[in-house]
Swiss-Prot record:
Source organism: Pelotomaculum thermopropionicum (strain DSM 13744 / JCM 10971 / SI)
Function: Binds to 23S rRNA. Forms part of two intersubunit bridges in the 70S ribosome.
InterPro entries hit by this protein: Ribosomal_uL14 (IPR000218), Ribosomal_uL14_bac-type (IPR005745), Ribosomal_uL14_CS (IPR019972), Ribosomal_uL14_sf (IPR036853)
CC per GO annotation: cytosolic large ribosomal subunit
Coiled coil: none
SMART domains named in the record: Ribosomal_L14
Keywords: Ribonucleoprotein, Ribosomal protein, RNA-binding, rRNA-binding
PROSITE patterns: RIBOSOMAL_L14
Gene Ontology biological process: translation
Any Pfam family hit: Ribosomal_L14
Subunit and partners: Part of the 50S ribosomal subunit. Forms a cluster with proteins L3 and L19. In the 70S ribosome, L14 and L19 interact and together make contacts with the 16S rRNA in bridges B5 and B8.
Protein name: Large ribosomal subunit protein uL14
Family: Belongs to the universal ribosomal protein uL14 family.
Amino acid sequence: MIQVQSILNVADNTGARRLMCIRVLGGALRRYASVGDIIVCSVKEATPGGVVKKGDVVRAVVVRTKKEVRRPDGSYIKFDENAAVIIKDDKSPRGTRIFGPVARELRDRDFMKIVSLAPEVI
């Protein structure tokens, strides 16, 4: 469950290390984002020589959350950290690698490129 001012780790190789959520997309009253939701973020930490720089405003999709997500079969999935992948306007990732597992819910939201690049889909 991500809201405005939440800090997320970055799960790709764009050069960003930490993001801060500044907007949850999906309507004026939308308060929280979960796995598979798109958010607008500010880059708070970045490595030198990366694609994105500190202070850049980017769009990202949430791939892991500490708050559990309920699945249709009644099971729950949760992760040890909040993480996101920086995306372009066409929902494709800006990086070329994805680090760590991602949730299966991304497949239902048409983030197939992220799912195919991920080392593990849970």
